[in-house]
């Protein structure tokens, strides 16, 4: 399951949206029970976040509509983040995970920050 259906994602893509991949486990794996399920026992890893971002890229046919939407601003802690993520510094591992799937350095830069910057520049122009 995903937070958005494919039909919803396609509509967002058609409107030029940038969709941020989230790290809150309930949005990453099915069957998550807040306060009961733990990331390690559920097997939640950064790779799952990359799966979701890759899915958006596949639906769009490019990387222009995907970004990192971490939500790591204090709304939750390690009890709901991927088990292989200890600090925000672990976000630096994402480019390697994308590279292993064949993404180019330009595509990775767009996903990591470029798409949101482009989107905001266009919105504010």
Go through each PLM region and give its residues.
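Short acidic/histidine-rich active-site segments
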Residues: 21-23, 60-85
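Outer-membrane beta-barrel pore domains
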Residues: 39-46, 75-85, 98-107
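Histidine/acidic residue-rich metal-binding segments in metalloenzymes
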Residues: 1-17, 47-64
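Short, electropositive alpha-helical surface patch
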Residues: 41-58, 80-93, 121-125
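Short, well-ordered secondary-structure micro-motifs
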Residues: 1, 31-32, 78-79
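Mid-to-C-terminal alpha-helical segments outside catalytic/metal-binding sites
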Residues: 86-125
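Alpha-helical transmembrane segments and their immediate juxtamembrane cytosolic regions
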Residues: 12, 20-47, 57-59, 73, ...
């Amino acid at each position: 399951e995903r937070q958005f259906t494919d039909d919803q994602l396609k509509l967002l893509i058609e409107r030029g949206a940038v969709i941020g991949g989230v790290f809150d486990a309930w949005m990453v794996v099915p069957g998550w029970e807040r306060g009961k399920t733990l990331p390690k026992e559920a097997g939640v890893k950064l790779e799952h976040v990359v799966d979701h971002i890759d899915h958006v890229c596949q639906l769009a046919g490019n990387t222009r509509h995907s970004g990192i939407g971490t939500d790591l601003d204090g709304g939750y802690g390690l009890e709901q983040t991927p088990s292989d993520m200890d600090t925000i510094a672990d976000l630096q591992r994402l480019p390697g995970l994308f590279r292993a799937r064949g993404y180019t350095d330009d595509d990775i830069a767009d996903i990591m920050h470029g798409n949101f910057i482009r989107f905001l520049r266009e919105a504010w122009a």
